[in-house]
């Protein structure tokens, strides 16, 4: 897998900003999804090319991922509560992680993009009340 042309969602989050810096510093051309003019400026300042599009629009994502080799889906909406344990706390994050992923997969198929990278996120296991989480949890 080459990282020549990378498309990133979640570009202005804590992880996204660091990934963009790393990729740009290592010679990758990075295109990043933006939801606002302010975010677009931040993305430019990081060395990437911002594109305004809707994460939930197959048509828009298919258009802005033409010529891309790798998609990195880093977008999340982690609740800001100390212990987010109600399903409603996770509604937007679930939409981003489920519907957004499906939309990106459609765009990837349409543009013959072979790689979509999506990291895991905090709180996948919920509140374990002090119980240790491991690979068998």
Q: What do the PLM-derived regions correspond to, one by one?
A:
Residues 28-35:
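Conserved glycine-rich Rossmann-like NAD(P)H-binding loop of the short-chain dehydrogenase/reductase
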Residues 16, 81-82, 126-127:
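Glycine/Thr-rich phosphate-binding loops of Rossmann-like dinucleotide-binding domains
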Residues 3-5, 68, 113:
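Phosphate-coordination loops involved in phosphoryl transfer and adenosine-cofactor binding
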Residues 9, 33, 71-77, 116-122:
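SDR active-site strand-loop-helix element
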Residues 35-99, 107:
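NAD(P)H-binding glycine-rich loop region in Rossmannoid oxidoreductase-like domains
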Residues 5-26:
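N-terminal Rossmann NAD(P)H-binding glycine-rich loop of SDR-like oxidoreductase domains
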Residues 88-137:
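Conserved Rossmann-fold NAD(P)-dependent oxidoreductase catalytic core, especially the SDR/UDP-sugar
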